[in-house]
Amino acid sequence: MMYNVTIRETLARTVQIEADTHEDAEFAARSLYRKCDIVLTDSDYIDTTFRVHGVPSYYKSPNNDFTLIKGDCVDTLSKFNFGFDMVFADPPYFLSGGGISCQSGKVVCVDKGDWDKPTTPEEMDAFNLRWLASVREHMKENATIWISGTHHNIFSVQQQLLKLGFKILNVITWAKTNPPPNISCRYFTYSTEFIIWARKSQKVAHYFNYDLMKLLNENKQMTDVWRLPAIGKWEKSCGKHPTQKPLGVLARLIQASTKPGAWILDPFSGSATTGIAANLLGRKYLGLEIEDEFLSMSKARREEIENISKKDEYVKRLAKAKIIIPQDNIFVTETIEERYGVPWL
């Protein structure tokens, strides 16, 4: 005889169990939930994804240590739960008001795009509060965030960080060793940018690789003034991004605040310099970007360092500049648990 047995869990469901008596059917149902040890082998796994609500990716590297997703950062982050070890953000500076500058001896327009047009202080504050609140929800309790800016936006960012409960650790001054000249000759040449370093929690301790930073600074404590060059031509082999950051800056802050294998988020991925630096240093990366042009450029940059000679060239350049100490086998090897533990496809 076939009996319908109701099993009450968080939700009730009915299964069909073939048995001679009601008691036998109930016993069979209970046996489905007995405690037991299960040992799985490779043959028990199938090539599938164990997620119903996975977020589709624009691109994933062959070993899944570099993922790009197309979409607005706030909207995309609302679709999944995941805790990152570190965040780097290069949000709009809101400075593209038709100004000019000098690059390679030529006068050029400094407009970056419509996304960087000046706005009101109130709108800037609301924008920064919105994306910072969203990112904070996806940071581990001991995670830190780095945010770059200039005087145009950095004070707004600082105020929103405090409002959300972050603890500001440092404000790094990036002093560019090769800044473009000021062609108006009416004020000092802009040669610096600021990078706020903050941790999510006031009380939970963060990670700081103090010894490595000291080693990279000739065994002296590293200060909050970093004298590093602006982006070099060798970093633009896959195209030009109007606000691309140099690998040297990203490599330093990634090493300072994460361990190998850490997950790093960039909500304004751009040309994915954060991701390239992360992978060169054995970290994993998720970048969010809305522009197809920049997604394509980022994909090309990541594919470029699949070439061992190109990867070695990048590492040697960074090592020569005393930004990193070369390591062997610096690409991350992914485990099955890690593959199915992320909420993107």
What does each of the following model-derived ranges do?
Residues 1-11:
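Short aromatic-glycine-(Arg/Gly/Cys) micro-motifs in beta-strand/loop hairpins
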Residues 293-345:
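PRPP-dependent phosphoribosyltransferase catalytic core
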Residues 56-297, 343-345:
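Core catalytic lobe of class I
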Residues 12-20:
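A short, exposed loop/beta-hairpin motif centered on an aromatic-Gly-Thr core
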Residues 9-13, 72-75:
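Short polar catalytic/cofactor-binding loops
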Residues 21-37:
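A short, charged, amphipathic alpha-helix used as a generic interaction element across diverse proteins
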Residues 35-56:
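Short, mixed-charge low-complexity intrinsically disordered segments
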